[in-house]
Amino acid sequence: VDDKIFQAGSTAEAQSIMEEYLDRISRHEVVLSVRASALDLLSVRTGERVLDAGCGLGEVARDLARLVGPAGSVMAVDLNPAMLAAARRRHVVVPEAGTITYRIGDVASLDHSGAFDVVWCERVLQHVADPGSAVHALARMLGPGGRLCVIDVDWSGLVVDGVDQTLTARVLHAFRGKVSHPTVGRTLRRRLLRAGLVDPVLRAVQAVSTRLDDAASVVPVLDRRESGLVPDVDRSLWFRSLDLADARGELTIALPIYVAVARRPR
């Protein structure tokens, strides 16, 4: 049985939990900062053709559509039909924005070679079967001079201080085992180069929080609503320990998020 986290919801309840998580994280100041940094590196221009690969609820696709304007276009792709339906429900036609086309598709097997000026892929590679193949596929989507932006987390860099470290190590080890590629964030620059792209730029945003409610909105293993991520034997003690550290004001949580941008040679 595949028990990896963040996979497409198999039930209405699972889908609802996933949508709630994505809604919550999209409003978090760290995610907003990461996206602002990525957009600064990309310098999206009016009239460009953009692919959002793994669009989720579509909030970035809508931002990109505003940047490219009516002369540009955005294709928003997601493998999960229910997620794509949710993105469509959230779509609002904005006259000064480019057209958004929503498509069901697998990031690793898209077939629009050379069709885009910009490709955006955020927090997707940690979940795909083969991140290297996925990056090569995304690079093929670019026309000459086109830019690819990949954003992802290095879950091995997740720090939780204020809780017994033996317990923490056990819980975080189990959590990382539920992510297909937990360390992919650190590999982004190398993967862009191996896909034949040039002039890579890498930035890291260190998400730091000293409040449990704030950190739990970004890190699922800290969230009681995701308690199934914690081994049964540790679950009760883990959340009691987090609550106690939080009440004492002794909790520190940190997580590195990487942004990498490179371009296809002209």
Locations of the language-model features?
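Conserved class I S-adenosyl-L-methionine
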Residues: V1-E48, E59-D63, L67, M83
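C-terminal helical/coil "lid" or tail adjacent to the Rossmann-like core of SAM-dependent
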Residues: D2-H28, D199-I253
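Conserved catalytic/acceptor-binding region of the Class I
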Residues: H28, R147-D213, S227-P231
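Class I SAM-dependent methyltransferase SAM/SAH-binding core
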Residues: L51-A53, L57-S109
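A short acidic, Gly/Pro-enriched loop at the edge of an enzyme's catalytic core
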Residues: S109-V118
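A short SAM/SAH-binding and catalytic strip from SAM-dependent methyltransferases
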Residues: D117-P131
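A short glycine-rich, Lys/Arg-flanked "PGG" loop and its adjoining helix->strand segment in the class I
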Residues: G132-R147
